Amino acid sequence: MVTRGPDTGALSTDVVRAGRHPESDIFLDDITVSRRHAEIVRAGDAYRVRDVGSLNGTYLNRERIEDAPLRNGDELQIGKFKLVFFEGGE
């Protein structure tokens, strides 16, 4: 769920793309963010985050990751942006 910014609302697709590309599901407009930076993927009741080849990396709870499970309350850092993952917030 996005709670602040231009993309506010629940994200209901199985793959959510975050990046500087204007057509990203979560548009993060800053030079520290790659055009195609990261994806949040839902598989059943589980969620994962994966970096998709970004220059500056994707961080989960302050650790750089390539692919990792997401849990409620986890903090993602993409470039200068910090995002907190909340599951099931319609």
Model-derived features: positions:
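Intrinsically disordered, low-complexity regions of eukaryotic proteins
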Residues: 9, 27, 41, 53, ...
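Intrinsically disordered, low-complexity acidic Ser/Thr-rich regulatory segments
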Residues: 1-29, 41, 82
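Short hydrophobic/aromatic patches on the structural cores and recognition surfaces of FHA
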Residues: 18, 36-60, 73, 83
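Short linear Ser/Thr-Pro motifs
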Residues: 24, 32-34, 54
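C-terminal boundary/linker segments immediately following FHA domains
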Residues: 59-90
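A short, sequence-level motif marking secondary-structure junctions
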Residues: 13-17, 30-34, 70, 89-90
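Hydrophobic aliphatic residue packing
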Residues: 26, 33, 49, 65, ...
